[in-house]
């Protein structure tokens, strides 16, 4: 609020003229925008010319800002409040400050029109002396004064005649009756008295009021024909989807249609005193700057225009049930099982700005001038405070509805879903219900200072918030009503907080290779189920446990053992099934290769000039038995050591009206068990539109915990034109979510959309598809990946003076690479990694330094591996891979596998023994020429399971 008390009359008139010109310009602009769809057919051009883009950007950047004109209007109206009335406010007065005092007005105008067409008057309608005059005449004078002001321009502060200190309550009531007969304005006085009596029936002022006195004014109101225009309650129009913003300007003094007015006059009296909570966003209490989502074809506003309303919890009438029928058509109920984010008040919602009365109301809240009449009404009628559960639906109603109508419609929440129109962007439910009722709860908290609520009322806000929870998963048949909830719904999930704390915690000096990255985007996309929330504490405990598999920093040469380190076929077979890390794109957007190769930046391997050796194959072989899925290499043609089995049930449909591809994922059955001991997995489904995975993005379902037969019933949506689908393939894969390690592949299904019949009803039905193993990409194998210039040497006896029998060493001299491919435009920062298969332990890996800004990097780096006997050379394979390092991710460029290429290692079939003829020739030459450097330039190739670059 702004203090405008210093303004003179001339200055106020000048400001009002500016506001009037602003309102006229707004009306002209709205008229122009309303006719735009008739001339412009292009959606993007219509969005630009209508100014929709501006309001969207403004809502994002200035969410907490209020329109300047509204602040000025509210400040000028605030100035009109009588100073004496503010000083004499007490608890009983606050119970009567309500919209009910304005029900005898004959017009309902928006605030900006009221300011423009009705000049303000500085005279105080109820001065300090009003409390000393006769109560009846003072009320009549105030009613006459209020008819000369705009209908809802300001909730005037009136002196309650029943609280006059010089007149007893019952005496004042006896005096008012003869005054009615003397004046010709009994209707006005009776309306005012009826509003005050039926609103609260206060115990402090009229404790023993007979019920006949409450009913008598209702009968006399209908007998005054000359005041018929004053007896109509200002019922605002019920909002519909088809809404024109200039209706209010066209109907300046008509607050509702003539048919509605006639029906009210036919009954003789308005339907009781329609109590309106000031927190309800009705058409007469705020300026709506509508977001025009216009459909050029239908020329109507799209469902995105739906106005979010804050629901008043306490709009109840004291009339009988027979009076509810005339207002039944005015009720518009919309249900939605979808969550959208609702900005907290007073933030604008998609172009809707906070009106001037919202500013006034917030100012009254701060000054403690809150209406307490609603709560006292609950005290006198505790049966009205009963709330029927929402039954998984959220209710939206016009602010003029009675409480009994609301109870009837809320109790009908269990109606069949096929009779309820569902919109995906109407009203939020779930946690956002707390925000939508923030004004109501604040009102109850402030009013509790004056009045102690009964148990029913104190219990109702929490009960209603509890009922606002998200709906239960629907059955398979009604999947069209389900919407895939993505975004930041689970921002308050304890698991997400746990992961954020772990990600923010300072890491020790150990390598990033040893730490599986757990802070993933999946937790921000998946709506975590109850099981994952319940297991949050377990995750925290497990996170606090020390990592027993942590590798010891530093490099040392371990003497080799004379046993046959490679003679364990069962271990070898298990290692050949490990997950290829750099292809494992299921690491929750951790686009890394073998367990995040960015650890080379930490210089974990402190190599000294005197010792180029790393841990030998002997030490590597001892760790074979403890190898897990997180120890990965490039060699594996499989995507995990889990058996692929089971099937998935889903259906495809293309919605022309939305231009969206819908993938309805129903359920899976008989999946592989990631937890073999407990025979369970934590599966979820992920989809891609190939070949361009990055453009359309991946979509995921929720993670269903601890089951092999998950039920999802979710719709994954892709915004894509139908003609583009002919060039796409749908890849649907099932994965096991592991909290602390990489996710495991459970199977996939791939459908070619080029030949898909979208008009066939059979294709829209749910079908079971068997899960298959992941296929290796062969399209990139023939690409030119560059070349590597290197030299190999086998040293059979590096230290002949020792007593124990020694083993040989293999020296690998990586000289340079030529013509490496550019995957990031003109940027390249390459390095080489070496592993001797079948040893895949982290301790046995060695890397070169990274050389940037060139496609022909010179490394000149020698790697030494010991522990080799002559027979081991027949079973081993040197794997050299080239990577492009960028920040925390590495992209695979190409690689070599130098060995004999027999397809077997120690009698076990392995997929990494696939050397080309050139690679085999180099390895044979090295074995046959010990203690001699054998040099060659070999072409890099895309290994069998290498990841497609994005």
Swiss-Prot record:
Gene Ontology terms for molecular function: neurexin family protein binding; phosphatase binding; small GTPase binding
Compositionally biased tracts (Low complexity): 608-620
Pfam families documented for this protein: C2, FYVE_2
Keyword vocabulary terms for this entry: Cell membrane, Exocytosis, Membrane, Repeat
Outcome of swapping residue 705 to Q: Loss of membrane localization
Biased composition (Polar residues): 140-150, 173-183, 219-230, 434-445, 557-567
Effect seen on changing residue 706 to Q: Loss of membrane localization
Domain C2: 644-769, 784-913
Residue spans of biased composition, Basic and acidic residues class: 87-97, 193-205, 246-264, 479-502, 531-544
PTM: Isoform 1 is highly susceptible to proteolytic degradation and is stabilized by the interaction with RAB27A.
Swiss-Prot/TrEMBL domain comment: The RabBD domain mediates interaction with RAB27A. The C2 1 domain mediates localization to the cell membrane.
Assembly and interaction partners: Monomer. Binds NRXN1. Binds RAB27A that has been activated by GTP-binding. Interacts with RAB27B.
Function: Isoform 11 acts as a RAB27A effector protein and plays a role in cytotoxic granule exocytosis in lymphocytes. Required for cytotoxic granule docking at the immunologic synapse. Isoform 1 may play a role in melanosome transport and vesicle trafficking. It controls melanosome distribution in the cell periphery and regulates melanocyte morphology. Isoform 1 acts as a positive mediator of mucus secretion by the surface mucus cells of the stomach.
Name of this protein: Synaptotagmin-like protein 2
Organism expressing this protein natively: Mus musculus
Lineage: Eukaryota, Metazoa, Chordata, Craniata, Vertebrata
